[in-house]
Amino acid sequence: MSDPLSNPTINTTNVGGQTTTQNTIGGVGGGKSNSVGTPYTTPLQTSAYTTANSLSATNSPIPNHHMINSNSSNNLSGMVTPGGAGLQQQQSSITSSTNNLGLLGQQQPQQQQQQTLLQPFTTQSRLISASCFEFFYIEMIDCIMKSSSDKQQAHKKLDKLGFKVGHRLVERLSLDTALFPELLDAVKFICKVFWTTVFKKTIDGLKTNHKGGVFVLTDSKFQWLQHLSFDSSASNKDCSEYVQFTAGLIKGAMSNFGFKCIVTFDIQQVSTCVFTIKIES
Amino acid sequence: MSKKYDKLGNDVFNKVEKINSELFTLTYGALVTQLIKDYEDIEQVNIKLEQMGYNIGIRLIEEFLAKSGIGRCSDFIETAEVIAKVGFKMFLGVNAHVGDWDANRKEFHLTIEDNPLIDFVELPDQYKHKLYYSNILCGVMRGALEMVQMKVKCTFVKCTLSDDSTSEIKVVLEEVLSDMIPVGYD
C-alpha cells in the first residue's frame, strides 16, 4: 500500500537535486562534503537513492545492524521500554561511534558518547550548539515576516519552508527504521524520534479519535517559545509565526511517510502548543 | 596561545546544549532557496544573508561572552585566534584556522575545514562564484565584532561549493570604535 506512494517521492527528490540550489541527499552531494564522518556517512547516503523497499532494516549497509528481523512495532517498543532490543541498538550505536573515533582523534570520545546518549535511536550525526540554531531561527522568522506583503503570505511561506525541511530531515532520521505498516506507527515516530531530534524531548501527549484519522500532539514546553518575553504594550501579541514552521515540519515528515495531512496548531498558554494532524484520504 | 584556545573551545563545546546539525543545514538550505526565489539578483541574496548574519551576530556575542568566559582581547591577533578556536568550535563544532596575515596585522584569512552549512548542498554552475552560500557567517562575524568595538569587513574569497578546496573568509580590521558618552551625561 505505501510503496506506490513512497517511490514517486524519492524520485522527485532526485530530480529536484539536479535543477536548482537546494539540499540534496545522495552520494554526489556527499562527495562534495568535507565532513569528517564521510567514510561512515556515504553508504547511508547512497542507500537513499534506492527504492523504498531497500530502506528497510534488512538491506541496511551497516554491518553491525541488529534489527534484521525487527519490525517497526519492536522498534517502537524498544523506545518505550529499554529492553534487549533497545540495549542492542545502543551497542550498535556505540560500535559505530568507535569506528568514527579513529578519524576524530582522542579529544572526541566524550563528545561521541554524549552524541550516542542524546540520540540513542537515530543515525549518528554531527552536532552544533543549540543556541546557534535558535538565533538563526529567530532571524529567519523575522526575515520572512518582513519580506512578505501580509501575515497570511508569511505563514504560507513558513509552512512551505517547514514542509521542505521536515520532508528531508525525516528521510535522514528514518534510514535505520523499517517501513511503518500503520499510520499510528508513523505518528509515534514523529512524537519520539523526530521531536527528540528537533526539540530534545518527546511530545508530552498524543491523543487520537477512535477512527484514527485525527491526532492531537501536545507539547507542554515548546522549545522555540521558551525564550520569548512578554511585552504588554506590544501591538502584536500573537507569536504564531514561531510555531507555523513546526506545523510545516510535521506535514513534510508525514508526507515522506506517504500520508498527506493538514496540520493546525493552537498556542494555549505560555509555551504550551497543541498540534492537530488530520489525515487527508 | 593557539593550544590554550583550542582546549577552551573543546571545553565550551562539550558544555553547551547541542542539537542535530542536519536540522540547521536543511533549514538554512531551505531559506537560501527561498531567498533566491524572492530576489531576482544573486547579489541581493548575498547582501540579505550578510544582513541576517549581522543581526544574529549582535545577539550571538552576548551568548559567546557569557558561556566562554573570555575577557577583552589584547590585540587583533588574539581576537582572530579566539574567533577561530573558540567561537567557531563553540557554535558550529568545527575547526577554523587563521593564516595569511598582512604586514600591518590588520588583515587575515580564516579557513573553515568542515562547514556544516554546506553538507548535502550542490550549486548549479550559474551560481558558482556568484552566490556566497555561507555569507551569513560573514555577517555574524561583523555583527559580533562590532559589539566589541571592532569594525571589520568580511568577505568570502574561497568556497568549496565553487570547486575550491577550502572555504576561506578574508577579515579586514577597518577601525577600532571608541566609546561614546551616553546622551545627556556629558
Curated annotation (Swiss-Prot), chain B:
InterPro entries from the UniProt entry: Bet3, NO_sig/Golgi_transp_ligand-bd, TRAPP_component
This protein's encoding gene: trappc3
Keyword entries, A-Z: Endoplasmic reticulum, ER-Golgi transport, Golgi apparatus, Transport
Subcellular locations according to the entry: Golgi apparatus, cis-Golgi network; Endoplasmic reticulum
Organismal lineage: Eukaryota, Amoebozoa, Evosea, Eumycetozoa, Dictyostelia
PANTHER family: TRAFFICKING PROTEIN PARTICLE COMPLEX SUBUNIT 3
Function recorded in the entry: May play a role in vesicular transport from endoplasmic reticulum to Golgi.
Family: Belongs to the TRAPP small subunits family. BET3 subfamily.
Protein name (record): Trafficking protein particle complex subunit 3
Main subcellular localisation: Golgi
GO terms under biological process: endoplasmic reticulum to Golgi vesicle-mediated transport; intra-Golgi vesicle-mediated transport
Pfam families: TRAPP
SUPFAM superfamilies reported in the protein's UniProt record: Ligand-binding domain in the NO signalling and Golgi transport (SSF111126)
